[in-house]
């Protein structure tokens, strides 16, 4: 119940900030919400305890963010160490994690957080060049200011070079001494992450489908914890691709979610099944694996998908 309330809160924040939002209802998914506004795209995992995010989920989240040039975020309320603090950025497997209030301030008040948590306490990164200018302007030597702050000369020089984060206490002292903001905001909405996009298929059916799609000239990015199994891509073609043995209630539910996500990330969707009759679920075609043998390249696959969608639409309105 607490998690459900959290997801609804995050969704309300996003919509209140003018984002288009798709929400997933898939246990264990690497993201719960995907949202877009102008040139910003966010993949968000909402979880009460941020330490429950697995490395596998995090890697998938980073893969999606890298592929779609989006920012991944984890929104939560606590960690194993205790409650998350408002206005503080935490990290889980290289992904920013924060409270919903912090997200609210960033999206609706244009107030980006500056404080981040690391082992040992709370820190900020400061504008080192401005610090040096202010120190010289106010007539402090390196030794004098270091002594006043209770830090070493080496640490102060590192602050000025931008080579070392500053503890929150020291940052507050600096801003009180110079009466000027020195902390640099953390742009949580434009986070850059590294991710391995070369992940192998897991099942014999996935391997078979991957091989066939590659023969058609499509590149593939495998995703483990999402409603789709892969993203198929070729030039400006992007297909959220599901793979299943047969059509089940789970397949239909996943296809519906793929349709929702596709609308936000401007991508088509397709499900390739071991055995099925061709049909469309929420504008996402379900096609039998053997259909891949009938097309020569990616363009023909898109034509097949579009033709199927058109036929289904005509049947509905005939």
UniProtKB/Swiss-Prot annotation:
Residue ranges of the annotated DNA-binding region, renumbered to this chain: 142-161
Family matches, as InterPro entries: Arc_TR_HTH, Cro/C1-type_HTH, Lambda_DNA-bd_dom_sf
Keywords of this entry: DNA-binding, Transcription, Transcription regulation
SUPFAM superfamilies for the chain: lambda repressor-like DNA-binding domains (SSF47413)
HTH cro/C1-type domain ranges (all copies): 131-189
Classification via Pfam families: HTH_3
Record flagged with keyword Cell membrane: no
Record-level Gene Ontology MF annotations: DNA binding; DNA-binding transcription factor activity
The protein's name in its UniProt record: Putative HTH-type transcriptional regulatory protein TK0539
Organism this protein belongs to: Thermococcus kodakarensis (strain ATCC BAA-918 / JCM 12380 / KOD1)
């Amino acid at each position: 119940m607490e998690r459900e309330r959290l997801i609804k809160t995050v969704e309300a924040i996003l919509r209140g900030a003018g984002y288009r939002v798709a929400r997933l209802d898939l246990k264990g998914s690497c993201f719960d919400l995907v949202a877009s506004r102008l040139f910003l795209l966010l993949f968000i995992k909402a979880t009460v305890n941020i330490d429950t995010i697995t490395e596998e989920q995090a890697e998938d989240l980073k893969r999606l963010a890298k592929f779609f040039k989006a920012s991944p975020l984890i929104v939560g309320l606590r960690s194993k160490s205790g409650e998350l603090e408002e206005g503080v950025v935490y990290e889980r497997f290289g992904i920013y994690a924060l409270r919903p209030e912090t997200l609210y301030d960033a999206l609706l008040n244009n107030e980006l957080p500056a404080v981040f948590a690391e082992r040992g306490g709370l820190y900020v990164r400061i504008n080192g060049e401005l610090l040096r200018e202010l120190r010289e302007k106010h007539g402090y030597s390196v030794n004098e200011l270091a002594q006043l702050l209770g830090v070493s000369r080496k640490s102060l020089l590192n602050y000025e070079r931008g080579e070392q984060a500053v503890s929150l206490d020291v940052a507050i002292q600096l801003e009180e001494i110079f009466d000027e903001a020195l902390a640099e905001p953390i742009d949580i909405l434009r986070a850059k992450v590294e991710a391995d996009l070369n992940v192998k298929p897991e099942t014999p059916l996935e391997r078979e489908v991957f091989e066939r799609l590659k023969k058609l000239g499509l590149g593939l990015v495998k995703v483990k914890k999402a409603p789709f199994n892969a993203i198929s891509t070729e030039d400006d073609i992007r297909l959220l691709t599901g793979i299943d043995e047969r059509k089940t209630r789970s397949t239909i539910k996943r296809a519906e979610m793929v349709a929702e996500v596709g609308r936000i990330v401007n991508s088509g969707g397709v499900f390739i099944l071991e055995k099925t009759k061709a049909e469309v679920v929420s504008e996402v075609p379900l096609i039998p694996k053997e259909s891949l043998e009938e097309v020569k390249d990616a363009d023909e696959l898109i034509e097949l998908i579009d033709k199927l969608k058109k036929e289904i639409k005509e049947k509905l309105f005939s």
